[in-house]
Amino acid sequence: MKQRVKKRWEDHTITGIGRREARAAFYEDTSEKISLNGQWKFLYLEAPELSPEGFMNAGTDGWYEIDVPSVWQLRGYDAMHYTDVLYLFPIHPPYVPSQNPTGIYKKNVVLTKEWLANDTVLRFHGVDSAFDVWVNGEY
């Protein structure tokens, strides 16, 4: 019998890869921050395994536009899931169902040499479940 291989996003011991310690964040408007809110390129898939080969480097022909922040279910992708009643998928910890809606977001951001002379932190709020980030093709 073939053993099912657990995927990275099924490992409950992984709470972050390459991320800073969690802490309270207080914000103020400053020239030292860039908002990434706005239109992003978006590709919806039924499962992460369906991600196109090299998607982090390839173009976005055939991708859609989606506003960030938003919830893709409210933009016509997938359906809303209300877990206060009943899960819509079989629960078999630690395995994630093979049909696992996935969104790939892309945005081009240009930073000046002056900006890059300082530490730069990429901060995401409200990401649901697991996610990966590539910057200039680097994981």
Regions flagged by a language model, labelled:
Residues 82-94:
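N-terminal glycine-rich cofactor-binding segment
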Residues 2-14, 18-22, 26-27, 41-45, ...:
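Accessory beta-strand-rich segments of carbohydrate-active enzymes
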Residues 32-43:
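Mature N-terminal segment immediately following signal peptide/propeptide cleavage
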